[in-house]
Swiss-Prot record:
It comes from Escherichia coli (strain K12). The chain crosses the membrane at residues 60-80. GO terms for cellular component: plasma membrane. It is a single-pass membrane protein. Residues 24-45, 82-101 are annotated as: Disordered. It is found in: Cell inner membrane. Keywords: Cell inner membrane, Cell membrane, Membrane, Signal, Transmembrane, Transmembrane helix. Residues 22-59 are cytoplasmic. This is Threonine-rich inner membrane protein GfcA. Residues 81-101 are periplasmic.
Amino acid sequence: MKHKLSAILMAFMLTTPAAFAAPEATNGTEATTGTTGTTTTTTGATTTATTTGGVAAGAVGTATVVGVATAVGVATLAVVAANDSGDGGSHNTSTTTSTTR
C-alpha cells in the first residue's frame, strides 16, 4: 500500500503544474483589471502595480492556484487510501474536484 500511495503522489505531483497553468494565467490577467496607474504583468505569475489593489489581486491569484493544487492532492490521497484494502486488487474510486474563482 505504501508503494501505491507513493506512485500516486509522484504522478500527481508531475501532472499538477500543467493542470493548473491556465487558471494561474487567468488570475494574473484578472489582477490587472480595474487598477489605475501603470501595471506590468509577466506570464500571469507576478503582478507589479503602482496601486495596492493590483499587487493584492496578483498575490491572491497565485495563492489560489497553490491552494487548489494542495487541496486536490490531499483529497485524492485520502480517497485512494480509504478505498485501498492492501490486497493488490483494483478498487473503484471516485474523486470530485470543484474549483471556484
